[in-house]
Amino acid sequence: MTPALKSTFVLAHRHLLGIEGLSAADITGLLDLSEEYVELNRQVDKKRASLRGRTQVNLFFEASTRTQSSFEIAGKRLGADVMNMSVSSSSMRKGETLMDTAVTLNAMHPDILVVRHHASGAVELLARKVDGSVINAGDGAHEHPTQALLDALTIRRNKGRLEGLVVAICGDVMHSRVARSNILLLNTMGARVRVVAPSTLLPRGIERMGVEVARDMREGLDGADIVMMLRLQRERMNGSFVPSSGEYFHYFGLDQKKLAYAKPDALVMHPGPMNRGVEIDSIVADGAQSVIREQVEMGVAVRMAVLEALARNLPNA
C-alpha cells in the first residue's frame, strides 16, 4: 500500500501559467512535494490515486518528446485518464481557431489541460475559456514553469539550497522560455543569476530582470556553482544570429576548458534536446559534473507534484 504524503501543500492558484506570480513559499511547497514523488518513483509500486476519476488532456501545438511523455507518465501514475491530443490530426489543421478548440474541449469537461503552444501568451488566453485547471508546458519564448521547477529541484538536491548560488545561464537566452522561467524562479529564491551569450542572443534590457550579463564564457562562468546550457533555437530565429555552429561552439560551447572557469564542483545542466558539438561537448554532457539525466528524472516528480497541488483545488477534491 502506498503511504500517505506528508506534504499537504495546495497551490493557491487555479492554473500554473508561469513562475511569475509564484511566491517563494509556493515554489518551496512544490519542491517539497516533488521530493516525496522522487522517492515514490523509485519504488516498485509508483501509483497513487490522487487523480482517479479525473481527465487530463495533453494539448501540444508544438512537438515534444520529453515534456509530453513526462506529463503523461505523471498523470497516469496519479490515476488520471490521460488523453494526448495530436494537433497534426486535429481540427486546428482544418482552420479551427485556438478559442474554438478551447470551447470544444471545455464541453468535454476535462479537469486538467496541459498545453504547449508556439505563441507567447496563447496558454493564458486558452485558460480564460476553460473551467478546468491549465498547466503551461511552454508558450513561445515566454515561460516553461515546470522546467524551471525541475531544474530548481535538481539543484537543491545536489547543493542543498538555492539561495546564494551563482547560476550561469549560457546560450540562446533571447529565444528561451526556459531561461526566462529560471531567471524568475532563481531570483525569487535568492540565487545570483548571470546570463552568458553573444549580444545577438541577448534580449534588449535583460538586465531589468535582475541578472548580471557576460558576453564571454571566461567572465560568465567565473565562480559559477551551476552552468546551465541552452540550445540554439533556430526554429524561432528569423535570420542569422550566429555566423556558424562551429564558430558558436568555439566561443560559447561548453567544453572541459571552459568548464574549468567555474567552481570545481559546479553542476552542468541542459533542458534538452542537446545539440552536441554546438552548445555542449559530449565529454562534458556525459561527464561526472553533469546532472542532465537527473533533470529528466526530476521532471516526472515535479509534474506529479504540480498535478497533485492543482488537483487539491478542484471541485470535490
Curated annotation (Swiss-Prot):
EC numbers for this chain: 2.1.3.2
Cross-referenced InterPro entries: Asp/Orn_carbamoyltranf_P-bd, Asp/Orn_carbamoylTrfase, Asp/Orn_carbamoylTrfase_sf, Asp_carbamoyltransf, Asp_carbamoyltransf_Asp/Orn-bd
Keyword line: Pyrimidine biosynthesis, Transferase
Substrates-to-products reaction catalysed: carbamoyl phosphate + L-aspartate = N-carbamoyl-L-aspartate + phosphate + H(+)
GO biological process: 'de novo' pyrimidine nucleobase biosynthetic process; 'de novo' UMP biosynthetic process; amino acid metabolic process
MF terms (GO), sorted A to Z: amino acid binding; aspartate carbamoyltransferase activity
GO cellular component: cytosol
Pathway: Pyrimidine metabolism; UMP biosynthesis via de novo pathway; (S)-dihydroorotate from bicarbonate: step 2/3
Residues reported in the UniProt entry to bind carbamoyl phosphate: 66-67, 116, 144, 147, 272-273
A Pfam short name: OTCace_N
SUPFAM superfamilies in the record: Aspartate/ornithine carbamoyltransferase
Binding site for L-aspartate: 94, 177, 231
Subunit structure, as described in the record: Heterododecamer (2C3:3R2) of six catalytic PyrB chains organized as two trimers (C3), and six regulatory PyrI chains organized as three dimers (R2).
Family: Belongs to the aspartate/ornithine carbamoyltransferase superfamily. ATCase family.
NCBIfam families referenced in this protein's UniProt entry, alphabetically: asp_carb_tr, PRK00856.1
Role summary: Catalyzes the condensation of carbamoyl phosphate and aspartate to form carbamoyl aspartate and inorganic phosphate, the committed step in the de novo pyrimidine nucleotide biosynthesis pathway.
Protein name in UniProt: Aspartate carbamoyltransferase catalytic subunit
Originating gene: pyrB
